[in-house]
Amino acid sequence: MPTLNQLVRQGRRRFEARSKSPALRGCPQLRGVCTKVYTTTPKKPNSALRKVAKVRLSNRLEVISYIGGEGHNLQEHSMVLVRGGRVKDLPGVRYHIVRGALDAGGVRERRRSRSKYGAKMPRSAA
């Protein structure tokens, strides 16, 4: 524990919060190109085949991002928009692909939470 004299001379060191999405470098989203689209399995209590993509961002950094929703049309060389946001049961996945932007199509037949999945208003409910 510092003495009062030491605190007068140097003060307390300020705690600096680390970014949870450092590859975006302060931007809300970044465009990128898919270099690999694959499935992976989640951590221990859960079981599934989660769809993820390795994306080279426009700032030349490579990140692993999650493809949300049921079904997708992404493949290698697809242009995608990447936002922050981790997937709790996939270690190393700290980003999400924005559905309905660039080459990533929206989720078909989606009725609820449509804005999160880039789905248009269904014709029948108009």
Swiss-Prot record:
Q: Which domain of life is it from?
A: Bacteria
Query: In its keyword annotation, does this UniProt entry include Ribosomal protein?
Result: yes
Could you list this entry's UniProt keywords, alphabetically sorted: Methylation, Ribonucleoprotein, Ribosomal protein, RNA-binding, rRNA-binding, tRNA-binding
Its Gene Ontology cellular component terms are: small ribosomal subunit
Query: Where in this protein does the record put region Disordered?
Result: 106-126
GO BP terms: namely: translation
What disulfide bonds does the UniProt entry report for this chain? none
Modification 3-methylthioaspartic acid, positions: D89
Q: Which GO terms describe its molecular function?
A: rRNA binding; structural constituent of ribosome; tRNA binding
Q: Does the keyword Membrane apply?
A: no
Into which family does the record put it? Belongs to the universal ribosomal protein uS12 family.
Which HAMAP family does this UniProt record tie to the protein?
Ribosomal_uS12_B
Function description:
With S4 and S5 plays an important role in translational accuracy. Interacts with and stabilizes bases of the 16S rRNA that are involved in tRNA selection in the A site and with the mRNA backbone. Located at the interface of the 30S and 50S subunits, it traverses the body of the 30S subunit contacting proteins on the other side and probably holding the rRNA structure together. The combined cluster of proteins S8, S12 and S17 appears to hold together the shoulder and platform of the 30S subunit.
Subunit note: Part of the 30S ribosomal subunit. Contacts proteins S8 and S17. May interact with IF1 in the 30S initiation complex.
Recorded protein name is Small ribosomal subunit protein uS12
Designated gene of the protein: rpsL
